[in-house]
């Protein structure tokens, strides 16, 4: 048996010979619970824990499924008990907060890079008497990355100091079921990345604008489920912004009744990447995407608009039930574009004109049997430099006069053939097909013979 401290005579414990700074760096890649367990090794390791620059706390990591056991870290003064899933949450609350308190006390005022806290429970809310002091402590220590995933429920508010911190570079707030946050005063001069999920604002669109105005160096903004669709207007106006993810699709997947947002504006002249998912707005007063390189667009009509389309489309030509023209014109400089099936439908019924995409070289089309390709040909004709065309699925809706949706692989193949014959500059065509539905492989394989010599056709079966 090789001794844990000596591999052979004269050898040394290589790990213990490493400098403290390097060991602290290694510990920073572990969860705080894992890092704390190293304190059992020796007094030196407990000392190192006091200087770990990254702290990550997750209350779900403190649940044991079989029985309530005494945690050996308790003997080191770090934690009380680890409880079973069957134990009451109330008992757990005396263990996990105690662990966080002891770690923060152990570290004192040493510099801190990242503080991550996840406390999510479907039954009991977070105790604000515990969380608020933790946030204050790490902000005083100059934390640069603050990551909070919390079920707030009855928690009155986030500490206002979060939005008045000169050291924060990255801020993530995922607050479920909490009250609106108050952002009357915002001063985040170094903030580069802001990630908000399920966050509501006390003054809705005004509060959101105040928050952005207090972040003069912001480069990346991620918004998920912030309920902007119920605001009077929504404006993302940040001159320094380079990446924007704006996904307010909570009602789409919940099957809730949707209403069109009134006004949505984007004044982001330096933006290079956009991911936008939302029901179409009534108006897009300002769309400034002068530097945009890549865009992923998933916009859709409300159920009321879809019903109107189904009724009028049988008897009328060029039916328009909304206006997303300004948004589509605003992204005309992109090089890489991904459009959802719903967006294709918006182009058909809510876009008076499709602009010329002079820089577009790569297009990805997501297809579904519920949505047609009526606008696709016009889009491709207006993309003179297109080199790569990707179809994710070949099925789409073909509506006849009687309103019956006919789905046949032959119809899709004919349209793809047409794309190949009319796009001489195309260099690559990628087809993601469902082999259980798009069963006629012979027709798919024939596409290669129709393409120009420089166009590569790639067939990729979808994994189910």
Swiss-Prot record:
Gene3D superfamilies: 1.20.1280.50, Ribonuclease Inhibitor. InterPro entries: F-box-like_dom_sf (IPR036047), F-box_AtFBL13-like (IPR053781), F-box_dom (IPR001810), FBD (IPR006566), FBL60-like (IPR055294), LRR_dom_sf (IPR032675), LRR_FXL15/At3g58940/PEG3-like (IPR055411). The keyword Repeat applies. Residues 12-60 form the F-box domain. Keywords: Leucine-rich repeat, Repeat. The keyword Repeat applies. Signal peptide: none annotated. CDD domains: F-box_AtFBL13-like (cd22160). LRR repeats lie at residues 172-198, 200-225, 233-258, 336-367, 368-393, 408-433. This is Putative F-box/LRR-repeat protein At3g59160. It comes from Arabidopsis thaliana (Mouse-ear cress).
